[in-house]
């Protein structure tokens, strides 16, 4: 039997991009800077796998608590439990 339990399982439609949004990711998404305490949305960029958070957190909003290398650390409530998610800036979007 084949192995069916990868980190991107059940994401066929969740990580799908619109037809006109395919291609190279803008450089501005790579060099985003966030302030500590700022609210950000987790929107996974499917064309870049490095630094992608778990699919469970796609579409959630969290607060920035720090930076770890090139990635940002966020706190997110998953049910009643507060969790720390580490994600690169390509997968984050500042809340307006």
From Swiss-Prot:
Keyword terms of this UniProt record: Ribonucleoprotein, Ribosomal protein
GO molecular function: structural constituent of ribosome
Pfam families reported for this sequence: Ribosomal_L21e (PF01157)
Ribonucleoprotein listed as a keyword: yes
Biological processes annotated in GO: translation
Tagged with keyword Cytoplasm: no
Classification via PROSITE patterns: RIBOSOMAL_L21E
GO cellular component: ribonucleoprotein complex; ribosome
Protein family (similarity comment): Belongs to the eukaryotic ribosomal protein eL21 family.
NCBIfam families to which the protein is assigned, alphabetical: PRK04306.1 (NF003303)
Protein name, per record: Large ribosomal subunit protein eL21
Organism of this sequence: Methanosphaerula palustris (strain ATCC BAA-1556 / DSM 19958 / E1-9c)
């Amino acid at each position: 039997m084949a192995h069916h339990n990868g980190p991107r399982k059940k994401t066929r439609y969740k990580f799908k991009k619109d037809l006109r949004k395919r291609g190279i990711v803008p450089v501005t998404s790579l060099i985003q800077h966030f302030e500590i305490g700022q609210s950000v949305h987790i929107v996974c960029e499917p064309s870049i796998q490095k630094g992608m958070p778990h699919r469970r957190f796609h579409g959630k909003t969290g607060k920035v608590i720090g930076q770890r290398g090139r990635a940002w650390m966020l706190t997110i409530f998953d049910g009643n439990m507060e969790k720390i998610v580490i994600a690169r800036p390509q997968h984050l979007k500042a809340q307006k």
